[in-house]
């Protein structure tokens, strides 16, 4: 099959969190099965990132220019980065999308659009409808507007989103929670398909202690980790309040809290002020965003990972923490909660008392903690990408006509 993935953000722009990681995992998994997979995305500053490389280096790394923008080839997947004429947060305006669709869209059997609050996906969906090309929409947790520009997002749903979903052959949800949200908002239940996310562990793990050493965190300290965008939706402020309710020490162990992730709308400054007011500044560290080995080192060196979100369609970071063998605490509003519960950690209400009680229970009960460490391996074994990739392959096949003899399955620009 010839598959086009459309996403506002994609590797190497990992600062946008989970979506680039998810799209790449699915794309590479399908390419390994022999499908022609292309990714259409926005350019968030490749010129700056690649300027130190020579032309020969760029070619060796799989980079070159296409008629539409930068092009990258990696493990059988070709990605096109459309120039961005305007950028605001994770939204861009990419006029070249119209030209791309006119020239290339007819080459694909199916289109998969990730995310809903952007112009790129909407433009491709409109073009796909006009060509009777089936397309799949995956909201990636954006469907319910929780924070930031809520009324604007509701207007988008009314004027744009309804058409996007109405024209979709299938809408992907990654948890039972997201299925309920979509159905309650009027998306036809027979159109919704549940497909969980996966987790991809590193081939080799960073040396234990590397992350703590980088931040001068003592080996004997009990380390609580939050890793993700410092966004109101993810409730880092609730975690800080919960941490402030905990004792400074449990037994011989000092408790420390690390926030690892990009700032969002000055949230870090508000957290810093709150930590000072609570008298815990000396035990709260902001590491900034972490990627690659640094991210996995943080998971591995932590004692507990916390995802206290107001709403989370799945919760990839909790799955990653479990893959590193670190027990987790997640709120009931996280899609991954049913998989985590009493296997790899605790599921709690979205309030500071519940989070604080769960953390103290985990850190004071070595037997329970050891059970959850073992459970992390069990959860990870259930979260490989193989099943989600197989599910998407079957879904796409049901949406597309039989292949025409002689048509290339090679990725296209």
Task: Name these PLM-found stretches.
Residues 45-46, 199, 227, 256-272, ...:
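Glycosyltransferase donor-sugar binding loop
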Residues 177, 198:
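Carbohydrate-associated surface elements
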Residues 134, 144-167:
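Nucleotide-sugar donor phosphate/pyrophosphate-binding loop at the beta->alpha transition
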Residues 4, 218-234, 240-243, 258, ...:
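Conserved donor-binding/catalytic core segment of Leloir-type glycosyltransferases
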Residues 327-330:
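Short hydrophobic beta-strand element within catalytic cores of glycosyltransferases
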Residues 342, 346-353, 361-367:
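Conserved acidic donor-binding segment of nucleotide-sugar-dependent glycosyltransferases
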Residues 51-68, 204-217:
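A short helix/loop element that forms part of the nucleotide-sugar donor recognition site in Leloir-type
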Residues 310:
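Aromatic "clamp/platform" in nucleotide-sugar-dependent glycosyltransferases that forms part
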């Amino acid at each position: 099959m010839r598959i086009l993935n459309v996403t506002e953000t994609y590797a190497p722009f990992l600062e946008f969190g989970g979506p680039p990681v998810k799209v790449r995992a699915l794309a590479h998994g399908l390419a390994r099965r022999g499908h022609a997979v292309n990714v259409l995305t926005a350019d968030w500053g490749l010129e700056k990132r690649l300027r130190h490389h020579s032309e020969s280096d760029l070619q060796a790394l799989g980079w070159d220019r296409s008629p539409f923008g930068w092009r990258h080839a990696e493990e059988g997947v070709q990605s096109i980065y459309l120039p961005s004429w305007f950028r605001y947060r994770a939204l861009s305006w990419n006029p070249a999308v119209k030209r791309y669709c006119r020239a290339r869209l007819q080459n694909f059997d199916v289109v998969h659009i990730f995310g809903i609050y952007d112009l790129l996906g909407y433009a491709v969906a409109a073009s796909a409808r006009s060509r009777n090309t089936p397309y799949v929409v995956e909201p990636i947790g954006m469907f319910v507007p929780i924070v930031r520009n809520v009324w604007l997002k509701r207007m988008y749903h009314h004027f744009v989103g309804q058409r996007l979903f109405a024209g979709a052959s299938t809408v992907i949800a990654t948890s039972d929670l997201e299925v309920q949200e979509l159905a309650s908002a009027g998306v036809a239940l027979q159109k919704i398909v549940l497909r969980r996310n996966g987790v991809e562990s590193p081939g080799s793990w960073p040396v234990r202690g590397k992350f703590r050493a980088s931040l001068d965190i003592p080996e004997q300290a009990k380390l609580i980790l939050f890793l993700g965008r410092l966004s109101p939706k993810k409730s880092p402020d609730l975690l800080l309040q919960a941490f402030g309710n905990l004792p400074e020490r449990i037994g011989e162990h000092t408790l420390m809290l690390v926030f690892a992730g990009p700032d969002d709308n000055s949230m870090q400054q508000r957290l810093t002020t709150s930590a000072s007011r609570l008298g815990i500044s000396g035990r709260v560290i902001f590491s900034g965003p972490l990627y690659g080995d640094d991210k996995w080192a943080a998971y591995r060196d932590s004692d507990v990972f916390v995802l206290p979100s107001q709403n989370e369609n799945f919760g990839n970071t909790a799955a990653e923490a479990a893959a590193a063998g670190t027990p987790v605490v997640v709120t009931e509003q996280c899609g991954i909660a049913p998989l985590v519960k009493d296997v790899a950690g605790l599921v709690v209400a979205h309030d500071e008392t519940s989070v604080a009680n769960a953390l103290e229970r985990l850190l004071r009960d070595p037997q329970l903690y050891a059970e959850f460490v073992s459970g992390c391996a069990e959860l990870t074994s259930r979260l490989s990408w193989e099943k989600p990739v197989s599910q998407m392959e079957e879904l796409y096949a049901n949406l597309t006509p039989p292949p025409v003899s002689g048509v290339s399955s090679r990725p296209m620009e």
